[in-house]
A protein has these predicted regions:
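Local cysteine-cluster metal-coordination motifs and their immediate loop/turn environment
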Residues: 110-120, 345-348, 382-402
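Short, small/polar residue-rich loop motifs at catalytic or cofactor-binding pockets
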Residues: 328-332
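Acidic, low-complexity/disordered tracts enriched in E/D and polar residues
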Residues: 1-50
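Flexible glycine/acidic-rich beta-alpha junction loops that bind and position SAM and/or redox cofactors
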Residues: 248-250, 269-295, 313-326, 350-354
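Canonical Radical SAM [4Fe-4S] cluster-binding loop centered on the CxxxCxxC motif
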Residues: 96-133
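Long, charge-rich, low-complexity alpha-helical segments
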Residues: 39-106
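C-terminal accessory region of radical SAM enzymes
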Residues: 236, 292-323, 348-390, 394-395, ...
């Protein structure tokens, strides 16, 4: 039946499990491990209940009276093990997304572009930007204090003199390194020199061709970035392309042209290039749209994404919800340091409060503060999320857009409240869980 199971094995399930009947499916949610499986009939539910009661595998098998029931049991076990929903003799191991172990560095405000939608409003170097030596020390202290991941952006990171040294240092001390770049300043020699020190790199292309990209990023840039994308990918660096369309360059055939871009780039690379579409326009240099307009924008972008890959939503959802990986927060508490050393606990730094400067306190101080903020605004400590069985799968949403404190905590009275959740949104989330599960797993073949 299953090479890893013996008849005297007992499966251990997390204690808090909720079942929801959605259309013809039964969604089984393990609340405390942010996990779920989908059952297709009442037979499977009955068999699951026996396993949860502590029946040995062999005892369940002995009670089975038909081929249909046996097939249902095999599919149930396959689902349980595919999602690590239970353990043999032990409970499943939980992991947590810990945003306070991640560091986002806006290393300079200088940029060679003046993009209309830039939420950092980058362009000119700040008067008091930190030095190379400052950043080397900050990274070392971050690692010693338990830091794991660092993302460099700007401005344009390559505009910072000595960026190569910082990049190498971050890699050499064991940090996972991500770089966000506009892709225009990378020479052949720089790419070959620095690629070994980068775990992941993301480039921005905000149009489907030279003409539409130029509307946002200026003329003559499109082909340069595409070439940089191809070179990094072919050197084995995990490479992605992030696209933020604006209403100025969205056209009737954008979906067709965007798919052509995706196909053209992937044909030239030996490794997969990941394409990401921004589904929200943040307040930027020349962009500030209402929430209603953003909903329309999001719907349009999701349509483009679906045209390129009809299963993209399912794939992204499953990829973002690994079994037993608990998301208690949107990421608030993760540290962002601006070029002048100002510290924030969200990467949308111009919409939240600063908590001081890295030149005034050690990194460990800010990491502890970030952990504190991460916990006090987690779904365990906000209303009504703390009572919701979907809380660790949903994470509560954006602490700026979806909460009463709008990302600003200093003068806000507890309890913090999520203000955008509805029964309809919960139902959509559960339907998405089912559809993604059905797309990704097939236990009947």
């Amino acid at each position: 039946m299953n090479g890893e199971l013996d008849f005297d094995d007992i499966l251990y399930f997390p204690e808090e499990i909720v079942t929801e009947k959605i259309a013809n499916d039964i969604l089984v949610i393990s609340v405390t491990t942010a996990n779920w499986i989908v059952l297709k009939n009442k037979i499977q539910l009955s068999l699951l209940n026996k396993l949860r009661e502590g029946w040995m595998i062999g005892q369940v098998v002995e009670e089975i009276e038909s081929e249909e029931e046996m097939a249902s049991f095999k599919s149930l076990l396959a689902a349980i093990f595919a999602r690590k929903f239970a353990g043999v003799g032990v409970l499943p191991t939980k992991e947590y997304l810990e945003g306070y172990k991640m560091l986002n560095i806006y290393i300079t405000n200088a940029c060679n572009l003046r993009c209309k939608h830039c939420f950092m409003r980058s362009g000119t170097k700040l008067k008091s930007e930190l030095s190379l030596e400052n950043w080397i020390g900050i990274l070392s202290d971050f690692k010693v204090s338990g830091g794991e991941n660092v993302t460099f952006s700007g401005g344009e990171p390559l505009m910072f003199k000595g960026f190569a040294n910082i990049l190498k240092h971050a890699h050499d001390i064991g940090l996972k390194v991500t770089v966000l770049s506009n892709g225009l300043l990378w020479t052949e020699n720089m790419i070959e020199e620095l690629a070994p020190f980068i775990d992941e790199i993301q480039f921005s292309i905000d149009g489907v061709n030279e003409r539409t990209n130029a509307v946002v990023r200026g003329e003559g840039n499109f082909d340069v970035v595409v070439e940089t994308v191809v070179k990094f990918s072919n050197l084995g660096v995990k490479t992605s392309v992030s696209t933020t369309f604006t209403y100025e360059n969205l056209e009737d055939d954008t979906d067709v042209r965007y798919k052509e871009l995706v196909v053209a780039v992937r044909r030239r690379t030996s490794n997969e290039v990941f394409f990401k579409l921004s589904k929200k326009l943040l307040p930027g240099r020349n962009v500030n749209i209402s929430s209603e307009e953003n909903e329309k924008y999001s719907k349009r972008i999701k349509g483009i994404e679906s045209f390129v890959d009809k299963n993209a939503d399912y794939e992204n959802f499953i990829a973002g919800h690994s079994p037993n990986l608990i998301a208690k927060n949107c990421g608030l508490g993760g540290m962002s340091i601006n070029a002048d050393g100002s510290v924030y606990f969200c990467n949308r730094i111009y919409e939240v409060e600063s908590y001081g400067n890295v030149l005034e306190h050690p990194i460990s101080y800010f990491m502890e503060k970030g952990k504190e903020i991460h916990e006090e605004t987690s779904v365990d400590n906000v209303e009504p999320c703390s009572r919701c069985f979907l809380r660790y799968i949903c994470d509560g949403g954006c602490r700026i857009d979806d909460f009463d404190f709008s990302g600003k905590l200093k003068n806000t009275v507890k309890p913090y409240r999520q203000i955008t959740c509805t029964d309809e949104k919960k139902h959509k989330l559960m339907k998405r869980m089912i559809d993604s599960f059905d797309y990704f797993y097939d236990f009947d073949s």
